[in-house]
């Protein structure tokens, strides 16, 4: 695992009126960018010290590395606010498909003990997508989020129900598994951890998805899978397969550090390692 400390490219020139793509191309063409890419590919290099970028320039520089590197990146910012700004900048450049936010599961501070369901979904989505081995993921987080333990990879695998279009599976088996995972049977799903059955259709709201899934069967065969809007019930996107995950904080054995969960080839980027370690220690639960 390599560690990148923010950041080291300085550009000079008139950048007024440039689009985000044009600015990104300026950073990509900088000679120091080639040096950075070479250092990150060198497995003998464990730490790279960088300097020279301020504000959104760090996001532009980071986006070039993320786009051209297949291994995951984890950017650790100082706090929720700073991480939020950095995440917003990256999504403006790279889109939202590969850029993920890993927040604390608590609404305010860990010490108040108030969980936030939306944050728990984001955390579970990150773990689920890392477990799948997706390439090019970029994760933005901060010390309070890293202080919380997560489930192990084995635990996540054991508690994940995978379904694919064309697969033959007994609907009773699915509902039994959902029940064993702690999902609540309801007439209509409206929040994570719920499922509903209407004829040949099973609606289920996974803790690893922003939207619930509608799984349509033809006999015992999965005919289609779609995400849908809770309020309008209208379909959003077709899926070839899905992973359904329960509330891991309740059903799982939460004993693993997030930094132990991520792949070994992950690049970590942070401003101050010693300060970060101290902050995680203070917030540790």
How would you name each of these model-derived features?
Residues 7-282:
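ASCE RecA-like P-loop NTPase motor cores
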